[in-house]
Amino acid sequence: MNKRVLLVIFFVTLLVADEVNSFSFFRKAKGFLKKIWKSKIARRLREKGMKALKNYANDVLNGPAEAPAPAAAAPEEPPVEQRRRRR
């Protein structure tokens, strides 16, 4: 997945949990959303979101990591001579 998509999912889950916890009329939905929040898949998404957020913050603060130097290119094959057409 794209890093931006993971960040969006991470922030949306945080906002949904915060809103649900702040309203009292969501009592039934609150229990359901707490179960979802504690589920394995939500935990994994939050972990990926935190990693993506940390990586993004490091990239912003330190600049992007330099790309490794390309390996020595394989020698190119000599050009193939074109055959003359007979008339």
UniProtKB/Swiss-Prot annotation:
GO molecular function terms listed in the Swiss-Prot or TrEMBL record: peptidase inhibitor activity; toxin activity
Bias-annotated ranges (Low complexity): 64-75
Cell compartments where the protein resides: Secreted
Tissue: Expressed by the venom gland.
One GO cellular component, as annotated: extracellular region
Similarity section: Belongs to the non-disulfide-bridged peptide (NDBP) superfamily. Long chain multifunctional peptide (group 2) family.
Protein's UniProt name: Bradykinin-potentiating peptide NDBP12
Natural source organism: Lychas mucronatus
Lineage: Eukaryota, Metazoa, Ecdysozoa, Arthropoda, Chelicerata
